[in-house]
Amino acid sequence: MEERNHENTLEKDLEAVGQEAQALEERLKAAEEELKGLKDKYLRLLADFDNYRKRMEEELKAREREGVLKALRALLPVLDDLDRALEFAEASPESIRQGVRAIRDGFFRILAGLGVEEVPGEGEAFDPRYHEAVGLLPGEPGKVAKVFQRGFRMGEALVRPARVAVGEEKQEEADLE
């Protein structure tokens, strides 16, 4: 009888272990299916992200091309004006000067249309964000005394700094002794 109880206990234990093993196998199968689903989802997201990145790169290139085309279309009339000026180069120096001045004025209008403005020049306060000091000249300290090369900005973005001489107080000979 004791042997029978022992066999019953063993059978129950074996049955419990079998049920537990079956439950673990079912959980493992469910986890494997979930892992497969998550892996598929990950791969789809990875592909979607790669496609998004490629679209953004293409869009950026297209916008850059549009910007260049816009600038070129705006600048081509200046080339046309220069061609016309060369045709009339036989004319008097004064008419050439007037033609070049008209071309320059037209070019400034184009720049303004593109949102580009000239950096403030002579008489304005020296600003290292927009001015490059290339020398000193007698004049009001801290002010731009002379512009050697114009500077331009588009909003807060600097296209090119103005190359300027900054004013400094003229030292008297007495100060030098």
From Swiss-Prot:
GO molecular function: adenyl-nucleotide exchange factor activity; protein homodimerization activity; protein-folding chaperone binding; unfolded protein binding
Tagged with keyword Protein biosynthesis: no
Pfam family, one: GrpE
Annotated coiled-coil segments of the chain: none
Record note on quaternary structure: Homodimer.
Family: Belongs to the GrpE family.
Listed name of the protein: Protein GrpE
Native source organism of the sequence: Thermus thermophilus (strain ATCC BAA-163 / DSM 7039 / HB27)
Lineage: Bacteria, Thermotogati, Deinococcota, Deinococci, Thermales
